[in-house]
Amino acid sequence: MKKEELMLCILRVRKHFSQYLYKLQRYCDNLDTEDKASIVIDDRLEDFGKNCIFIWDIFHLNFNDKKLISAITKYVENECVSDSEQYRDFLDSYRKCISIAENYLIELPFETEVKNEVSISDFLKNISVKVVDNTSQSLYDKVFKIIDIAGMVNPKGVLIFANLKSYFEKEELVEIYKYAVYNEVNVLTLEHGECEQPLSYEHIIYMDNDFEEYEW
C-alpha cells in the first residue's frame, strides 16, 4: 500500500461482518482479556487497544469517550512536561493553591493531609476537560474533527471506521480521505458488500466467505 493511500477492507458476508466489528470493538476497549490483539507500528508489535480508535457508529460520535479524553489529557501532559519552563510554572501554581488550602485546613480541629504533587493529566481530569460537541455541526464535519483528534493524540495509531461509505457521496469520501492522508492519519474503513472500483486514495482488501484476503 502506498503512503498516500488508506485501507478499505470489504467483507462479503453480513454475519461475518457483524462478528468482525464486535470483535474489533472488544479489542479496542481491551475487553478480551484472554485473547489479546496486537498491531505493528514502526516494525514493533504494540497493544491494539491502546493504538486504535474504533468509530462503530458515526451517527453517535462521542468526542468525550473516556478513551479519547484520556488520550487528550496524556497528550497535553507530554507537551507541557517537554516544556520545562511551562511545567515549572504549573508546579509552582499548584503549590500556591495547596498553600492557600492549607491555611484553612490547619484551622480544623483534626489533622489533614493533601497531595503535594499532581500529574497534569490528573489535574485536567479534576477540572473536567471536555471536547465541545457542536450539535449543529454536520456529520461530514464531525468526521474531519475526529481525524484531527486521532492524529493529535496518537499519530502512529489507526483510526477505524465502520460503514463510512454508507453515509457520504463519493466526492465527500475523497475529501475525507485526502484530509486524512494530508494529516498523516492512518485510517482503516470496514465495509460490507461486493468489490468495487477504488476511489482516489483507497487501497482495497477484499475478504471472502473463508476470510481469504485479496487485494484489488
Residue ranges, per PLM feature:
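Glycine-rich P-loop/Walker A and Walker A-like loops and their local beta1-loop-alpha1 context
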Residues: M1-V81, E85, K170
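GG-anchored amphipathic helix commonly corresponding to the ABC/SMC/Rad50 NBD signature/C-loop
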Residues: L139-P155
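Conserved P-loop NTPase "ATPase switch" module shared by AAA+ and STAND
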Residues: G151-E169
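Flexible, charged surface loops at secondary-structure boundaries
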Residues: M1-E4, A150-K156, V181-Y182
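Conserved P-loop NTPase mechanochemical-coupling segment
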Residues: K96-S138
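Structural motif
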Residues: I10-K15, Q19, F161-S166, E191-G193
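Short acidic, S/G/P-rich loop/turn micro-motifs used as interaction or catalytic elements
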Residues: K15, V131-Q137, N163-E169, E196
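Alpha-helical oligomerization segments
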Residues: K170-W216
